[in-house]
């Protein structure tokens, strides 16, 4: 059977560049180097058209001991179809490094992306930082220190790591107050060095949207509430969405209605 059909273009195609090196870390007794990479997913541009799309920088979790920048990217296609670029970012994990090097890596990635904004077709003035669990901790820390240049090292320092909105999912906030079951997750040996996020909260923090599940048995809801309350007390803008009954890294967080709430927040808060 032969058919001729007319297709109406309702959404963009999506493309992925999966091996972009944004920096490097010393390795093997400081005698070698290992690359820091990011994966960049974008709406496919029309022929000859210049892009200037907003960017979501995404940080995977992994108890600060492991990370996979691509593991959540299939769920991020939804945002790419809405006209956003998404950068899944590698950061150092603590069998190789110590606090605050993971935050330094992420802030370097943000500055790198700003420096290459025209090349990649992204808008360096419209960046959302979003991450889950340990990545949510780094998300909050980097979001709160974008203006004061803390942890800015490694290159591209003529750009800031400031972002316009911050969306941590079930973030760790004050690690000293948490009870972790060692049979469920192994935290880094230097966990006591990880700063209390609330110590960085100021009135001029970028807008925050915090997501947390009421049934989270790994990072309790009280951690997300602690960050929300600290932002509210400081006079910064903060929203919080509690997913009833949702566990840690629950599939509930990637349902269309939750993504729609995230998108609504982003579109209201980006300049």
What name fits each language-model region?
Residues 7-12, 25, 163-200, 206:
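Mobile cap/lid helix-loop segments that gate and shape the active-site cleft of serine hydrolases
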Residues 69-88:
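Short amphipathic alpha-helix adjacent to the substrate-entry channel of hydrolases
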Residues 221, 225-271:
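C-terminal catalytic histidine-bearing segment of alpha/beta-hydrolase fold enzymes
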Residues 210-212, 216:
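Short beta-strand/loop motif that positions the catalytic acidic residue
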Residues 50-62:
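Short beta-strand element of the alpha/beta-hydrolase
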Residues 108-180:
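Primarily recognizes the serine-hydrolase "nucleophile elbow" in alpha/beta-hydrolase
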Residues 59-61, 113, 212:
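The conserved beta1-alpha1 loop
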Residues 1-50:
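N-terminal cap/lid segment of alpha/beta-hydrolase-fold proteins
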